[in-house]
Amino acid sequence: RSSDLELVQQVRNVSSVSKLTYSDKSLISEVDSDLIRTPVAGDAISDNVKKAVIATEDENFESHKGVVPKAVLRATLGSVAGVGSSSGGSTLTQQLIKQQVVGDAPTFTRKATEIVDALALERGMDKNEILTTYLNVSPFGRNNRGQNIAGVEAAAQGIFGVSAKDLTIPQAAFIAGLPQSPIVYSPYAADGSLKSKENLDRKSTRLNSSH
């Protein structure tokens, strides 16, 4: 369907320009994005990272059709009504839709659109394409220059000084957890300096425990 194709194109769009809009989505202006990002093909990303992200974010990724109904219900109640937990309900497909299409406003309408679009995206892209796109667009905090980074290649280069295809299992495990809270978990501050001992301990623990 044409609508599915348009959705795929929107999800794949990696723009260096950020659009500022009014509440009705009409355009205010366009500004250059400050994100450092280098999109790469799926075969240029280590399987270590792919496996780590699936294990961390969406263990049912290979089998679901875009959503996990029980998890969606639990997370929707948590985020909108304040009942239970609001975490753990979004598949990688839903997270990709949230980042690229619908945003993260805590409303039933937004969540419903996210679910419908996630199901549609799984019709238009295969699992490897969805995972690769997720890894190319997700925020990963800051690099060692203090610049905001998005995409696994920028994260690999900016944090470990290697390409995404060369990430080891411990490095991949560390990077896989960054999109959950990229600025908090980033080992670097806005000026490029190493952050607090607490954050560095997290990096050290993750690297040492993931052999």
Give, region by region, the residue ranges found by the protein language model.
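Flexible, acidic/glycine-enriched loop-and-adjacent beta/alpha segments
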Residues: 41-92, 144-160, 167
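N-terminal type II signal-anchor transmembrane helix
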Residues: 1-21
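N-terminal post-signal-peptidase region of extra-cytosolic proteins
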Residues: 4-7, 33-42, 56, 115
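Solvent-exposed coil/turn segments that connect beta secondary-structure elements
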Residues: 23-26, 33-34, 45-48, 56-59, ...
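Soluble periplasmic/extracytoplasmic beta-strand elements of cell-envelope proteins
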Residues: 17-23, 27-32, 39-41, 52-55, ...
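Non-catalytic, structured segments within soluble enzyme domains
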Residues: 92-206
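Envelope-exposed proteins and targeting segments
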Residues: 14-16, 36-38, 49-51, 68-70, ...
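Short, small-residue-biased leader/transition segments that mark boundaries at the very start
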Residues: 2, 207-211
